[in-house]
Each structure stands twice: as C-alpha cells, then as structure tokens.
C-alpha cells in the first residue's frame, strides 16, 4: 500500500494536533494514538482516552533524532552507546534516555527519563516532519482490547468520527523493543 499522504490529509492531521486533540495513525506494527507532546491538554486527553495513569510515562516517536533533542539529555552517552542507538534508528527500537530537567512530567510520569524512537515508517516520518516535532505515541486500543491494526479497527474502538491518518502498518507483528539508552538493558522484547 502507498503510504505517501496527500498534502490535504497531512494538513488535516496537523490541524487536529494544533487544536490539542488526539489522532490515530499506523506505525511499524499497530496503529498508534498520539498528540502534541508540548500540550498538557492534549496529553491529558490521550491519557483519559487510554485510561492510562500519568505516572507511567509515555513514548515519543519522531522523524529524526534532532526532533527528540529538546526532550532528552544525551550528554552522558559514550561514543559506543551513541553508535549502538544510531545503528537501530530509524527503526522499531525505543530507547529510554535521561530526560531534560524541563521535560514536562506529563511525558515522563514518575521517571527522570523518557522513552523515544526515531521511526522508519514513511507515513509517520511525513507526519512528524509536517508537524515539526515528535508525537506522543501509544498503541491505539482501549483498556482490555487488542491494539488496532487497521483504520476500521480504530473506528470500531474509538468511534467513526475519531481522526485517523489512513495507511498501512509496517507489517511487524510485535510492538517496538524498549532498551535503556545508557546500559542497553532490555525492558521489552520487540
């Protein structure tokens, strides 16, 4: 399936994000729901939708490492750690970095760290580039339901009027692997 968004669809998604609302979009394995990481209003809407406590923290998904720099502190990374991370990106591996002190608690939760990923999904890259920043990203599913893998499944769980960027997932069966950026410790198998 062609994942190149027509400019009208990108413009609509960006408008929804700018209005502090949540959108759904395909990622490497499943559909995600996301919003503007700098909007507490939008993040609280997402957390309420997912019935997820703010203390758990969230993941940011980005088109490039540059988009993530305002949120994370990569100064403690050695050259070999940096090389290990960049060898996985862009791709379906999420790394937990120390957060910058100014990174909002609505993103980090009870942690002093933040999980981030540079995606290789062309549609998400285009969306993040058009919006000019990363998106909060978590699986598109209601509590107790399986993650959505199609636009139809998103509409079945969230309603027909829920804003969805239509497209195909990347075909992976498992969600992204999650690792500690400093130690390489595996938190979740991908």
From Swiss-Prot:
Protein name, as recorded: Threonylcarbamoyl-AMP synthase
Reaction equation(s) it catalyzes: L-threonine + hydrogencarbonate + ATP = L-threonylcarbamoyladenylate + diphosphate + H2O
Pfam families, sorted: Sua5_yciO_yrdC
Record has Nucleotide-binding as a keyword: yes
UniProt GO cellular component terms: cytoplasm
Entry annotated with the keyword RNA-binding: no
Subcellular location: Cytoplasm
Source organism (scientific name): Klebsiella pneumoniae subsp. pneumoniae (strain ATCC 700721 / MGH 78578)
């Amino acid at each position: 399936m062609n994942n190149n968004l027509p400019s009208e669809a990108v413009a609509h998604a960006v408008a929804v994000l700018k209005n502090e609302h949540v959108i759904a979009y395909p990622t490497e394995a499943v559909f995600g729901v996301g919003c503007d990481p700098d909007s507490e209003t939008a993040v609280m809407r997402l957390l309420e939708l997912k019935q997820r406590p703010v203390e758990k923290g969230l993941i940011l998904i980005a088109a490039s490492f540059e988009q993530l720099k305002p949120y994370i502190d990569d100064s403690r990374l050695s050259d070999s750690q940096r090389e290990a991370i960049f060898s996985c990106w862009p791709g379906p591996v999420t790394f937990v970095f120390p957060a910058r002190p100014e990174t909002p608690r609505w993103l980090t939760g009870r942690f002093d760290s933040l999980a981030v990923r540079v995606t290789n999904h062309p549609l998400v890259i285009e969306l993040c580039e058009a919006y000019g920043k990363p998106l909060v990203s978590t699986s598109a599913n209601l509590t107790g339901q399986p993650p959505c893998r199609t636009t139809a499944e998103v509409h079945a769980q969230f309603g027909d009027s829920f804003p969805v960027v239509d497209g195909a997932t990347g075909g992976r069966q498992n969600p992204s692997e999650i690792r500690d950026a400093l130690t390489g410790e595996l938190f979740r198998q991908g």
